[in-house]
UniProtKB/Swiss-Prot annotation:
Its cofactor is Mg(2+). It comes from the Archaea. One of its GO terms (biological process) is DNA replication, removal of RNA primer. NCBIfam families: fen_arch (TIGR03674). Binds 2 magnesium ions per subunit. They probably participate in the reaction catalyzed by the enzyme. May bind an additional third magnesium ion after substrate binding. This is Flap endonuclease 1. Interacts with PCNA. PCNA stimulates the nuclease activity without altering cleavage specificity. GO terms for molecular function: 5'-3' exonuclease activity; 5'-flap endonuclease activity; DNA binding; magnesium ion binding.
């Protein structure tokens, strides 16, 4: 998902602890897709309660949010609104990929394959129920969230220009939307299996500073947007044969994306609209506040309604209580 400009991005390995005492907006759908793909049973099926409701997202949001709070990182979750019409092609392609994955899963089951994880992990849907349950859990935990009018990553990036320190997301598109700082791999760090390969790699959290990316490549924000569009974004197909490094070289030589397209004899549909969307996306001003967690409601919701282990939940609820007391003074200092 998003644009792949990783080859020209300056990143720094970091840790949760090193990012403490800061507030970050979170591209929630981006995180939910990661959780639905990675938090699964041994056979690849998503975690479910006794009623057949998917709970992978609740498991991930609960434990990862507490982990952030324990490291004095204050999260503000941002939910997607109505997608831009520019994204229709991407949405259709993703739906086709899921349908293909479902067909491959059925074939694998018929063949009697035992390891179905690679198939299940490619079939993820963020349903209204998943969104509602996530918001309900965040409400009980006292964690604020913002409903974006359109793209969540655009709203989360906009918030970095106001009073949050950065955005937590895997997508480099946040840089095109002007996010001052991005934290990546904060939901999937550690030893991870490479998709569709029987090998593992260690993934470390990292941060990216927009100004460093621009300075290191000697470009401006408009040129960075042009590079992303040449490579391809959720709103357009990239130009075949052009990766981030080649796009950078072309942009620096020709000056801007329109000059590049004229030089190579190519066209990108809706170019002006795409550029404008990255520069002026639909966003809202917001007011958020961290509240005291309702630990009884959390326990009832997770344990009584969704079959979570009461013993495990209570251990983490105690951590949540302690964290709330420890962070109250800092929150007052930060947001008054």
């Amino acid at each position: 998902m998003g644009t792949d400009i990783s080859d020209i991005v300056v990143s720094h390995e970091t840790s949760l602890k090193d990012q403490g005492n800061q507030t970050f907006s979170i591209d929630t759908y981006n995180i939910l897709y990661q959780l639905l793909s990675n938090v699964r049973q041994y056979d690849g099926m998503p975690l479910m309660d006794s009623h057949g409701n998917v709970t992978s997202h609740l498991y991930g949001i609960f434990y990862r949010t507490i982990n952030l709070l324990e490291n004095r990182i204050r999260p503000v979750y941002v939910f997607d609104g109505k997608p831009s019409p520019l994204k229709n092609r991407t949405i259709s392609e993703r739906q086709m990929m899921k349908e293909k994955a479902k067909a491959e899963l059925e074939e694998a089951i018929e063949r009697g394959e035992e390891d179905l994880r690679q198939y299940y992990s490619r079939i993820n849907y963020i349903t209204p129920q998943i969104v509602d349950d996530t918001k309900k859990l965040l409400d009980y935990m006292g964690i604020p969230y913002v409903d974006a009018p359109s793209e969540g990553e655009a709203q989360a990036s906009y918030m970095t220009k106001k009073n949050v320190d950065g955005v937590i997301s895997q997508d480099y598109d946040c840089l095109l939307f002007g996010a001052r700082k991005i934290l990546r791999n904060f939901a999937i760090y550690g030893r991870r299996k490479v998709p569709r390969k029987n090998i593992y790699k260690t993934v470390y959290p990292e941060y990216i500073i927009l100004d460093e990316v621009l300075s290191a490549n000697q470009i401006n924000q408009d040129q960075l947007i042009g590079i992303g569009i040449l490579v391809g974004t959720d709103f357009n197909e990239g130009i075949k044969g052009i990766g981030a490094k080649k796009a950078l070289a072309l942009i620096k030589k020709e000056g801007d994306i329109k000059s590049v397209l004229k030089h190579i004899g190519k066209n990108i549909e809706n170019l002006d609209e795409i550029i404008d969307f990255f520069k002026n996306p639909p966003v809202v001003d917001y007011d958020f506040k961290f509240r005291k967690p309702d630990t009884d409601a959390i326990e009832h919701f997770l344990c009584d309604e969704h079959d979570f282990s009461r013993e495990r939940i209570r251990d983490h609820l105690e951590s949540l209580r302690k964290n709330d007391q420890a962070s109250t003074q800092f929150r007052l200092d930060s947001f008054d």
